UniProtKB/Swiss-Prot annotation:
Domain of life: Archaea
Protein name: 6-carboxyhexanoate--CoA ligase
One Pfam family per UniProt: BioW
Origin species: Methanococcus vannielii (strain ATCC 35089 / DSM 1224 / JCM 13029 / OCM 148 / SB)
Enzyme class: ligase
Chain ranges passing through the membrane: none
Family: Belongs to the BioW family.
Length: 245
């Protein structure tokens, strides 16, 4: 098996990125699809496309995808409140476990929204329960690498008219991080016209329309306990090959 990674940028600003895990006979087909994805991105034609191919030498981990749930909302304010409620419910468990002040949960969620609304990060921001940024490079964030979904899951997702290719990418990321030590994730797309975002917890992957307005930036934030072994977890989300089914 091989890992393919595509990164595209324009004038040094991130435009598009994607990852796949492939058998040898599918490399050319997948490489072409990744390049096409970069060239025709709605945020602009990139001036740089990097495509990296690596043979996978370690054992692949197979993970069952977290449940996909699509919620209904007609405006950004309602969507933000929905996402806050999901995050608050999950974070309360860990604030209680760690003896943290419940009054600071909303401050933590506010910090996450500030990060995703700023946008233009290649990777994700990581926040502990005190709102501290834990990435080594806060401009780039951390990347979840060496991931893909099974062909069966891809087909299942695309058979649902409400779901898209973006759902495939997102469910792979969310499932991996929640199985490797993170508490929750919130994400909005860096595609300007795509306003569906999501919150992911172990209870599910909650798709929320209008989590941002069209034309706005997007971003991704992971939440983690203060006591977590950050170096080990970062190593796993980057290097452990995972296929989500």
């Amino acid at each position: 098996m091989f890992s393919l990674k595509m990164r595209a940028s324009k004038d040094g600003v991130h435009v598009s990125g994607a990852e796949r895990i492939s058998t040898e006979n599918k490399i050319e087909e997948i490489a072409n699809s990744l390049i096409k994805r970069a060239l025709f991105h709605e945020n602009g034609t990139p001036d740089t496309i990097n495509l990296k191919l690596e043979k996978i030498t370690s054992e692949i981990t197979y993970l069952k995808h977290i449940p996909i749930k699509t919620l209904i909302s007609n405006n950004k304010e309602t969507s933000r409140n929905i996402s806050r409620n999901i995050l608050r419910k999950e974070l309360e468990v860990y604030f209680l476990k760690n003896g943290k002040d419940f009054g600071k949960i909303d401050i933590l969620i506010d910090t996450a929204f500030e990060i995703i609304d700023k946008g233009n990060m290649r990777g994700a921001a990581v926040l502990d329960l005190d709102g501290n940024r834990l990435e080594e490079d806060t401009e780039k964030g951390v990347r979840v690498k060496n991931i893909d979904t099974s062909e069966e899951l891809k087909s299942k997702i695309l058979a649902d008219s409400k779901l898209t290719d973006r759902t495939i990418d997102a469910i792979a990321i969310a499932t991996k991080v929640l199985n490797f030590g993170f508490i929750a994730e919130i994400c909005t797309s860096d595609n300007y016209s795509y306003n569906i975002g999501y919150v992911a917890t172990k209870s599910g992957y909650f798709r929320i329309p209008n989590l941002k307005n069209e034309g706005e930036f997007g971003g991704r934030v992971f939440f983690i306990e203060n006591s977590a072994n950050i170096e080990e977890i970062f190593e796993k989300i980057e290097k452990t090959p995972v296929i989500v089914y």
